[in-house]
A protein has these predicted regions:
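Conserved catalytic or regulatory cores that recognize and/or transform ribose-phosphate-containing ligands
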Residues: 1-212
Length: 212
């Protein structure tokens, strides 16, 4: 039994207003503390590329067209969401100190573009996060590699899926290897390359500021 029932009122908001609403809800949970963020593949990543290889197509749109939207949801999106949530749960159990671990997987904002989602998570990383853990094979994901660049730019500690320090040099190595392997199969790696360039620029800037 509920004392109040949700209404069917219609609201029209700007993007930044929706962001403020979402962050106000997150702040109710964090209450001035900072979280650990679990970065994991969702819309892109190794699972997607393996499916592209299997079905002999080059893009996500081609895969959806060939196999159908329902197939894509069942075989790519839903497994990625489950893996991301499982990863965040494993991080929380590993830490075992009550720290809130945030996963982006359950969050939906109808009408948002991919850049708007990325801007939202970038703000969360820069303002409400104290470290970022990356799931296995994160280097194949456009979103994860972007979040790695943000973490490095913000000076956040980064860890791999087992809790070992990741760091900029290892991240650059992993991202470069992923791009090379995907390039060899003819996939479009422009977004991965852009994120790698971001990290490399941060590395050069840091070395210039703190020469050995």
């Amino acid at each position: 039994m509920s004392f109040y029932s949700p209404s069917d009122s219609k609201f029209t908001r700007l993007y930044h207003e929706e962001v403020e609403i979402a962050f106000s809800a997150i702040d109710c949970v964090l209450n001035r503390e900072k979280s650990v963020y679990g970065s994991a593949e969702l819309t892109t990543g190794l699972r997607l590329y393996e499916a592209l290889r299997e079905h002999k197509v080059k893009t996500r749109d081609e895969l959806k067209q060939k196999m159908g939207a329902a197939w894509f949801t069942s075989n790519i999106w839903n497994p990625n969401v489950k893996s991301a949530r499982d990863f965040a749960e494993s991080v929380r159990h590993t830490l075992d100190d009550g720290t809130t671990v945030i996963t982006p997987a359950p969050f939906t904002a109808p009408g948002w573009s991919q850049p708007e989602y990325l801007a939202f998570w970038e703000t969360l990383l820069r303002t409400r996060t104290k470290s970022v853990w990356f799931s296995l094979n994160w280097q194949y994901s456009n979103g994860c590699t972007f979040e790695f660049a943000v973490a490095e730019d913000a000076g956040l500690p980064t860890f791999d899926h087992e809790g070992r320090p990741l760091g900029r040099s290892k991240g650059i190595e992993l991202m470069g290897g992923a791009i090379q392997s995907l390039d060899e199969d003819g996939f479009n790696t422009s977004t991965l390359a852009e994120n790698l360039k971001r990290v490399q620029t941060i590395d050069v800037r840091t070395r210039e500021a703190f020469p050995v």
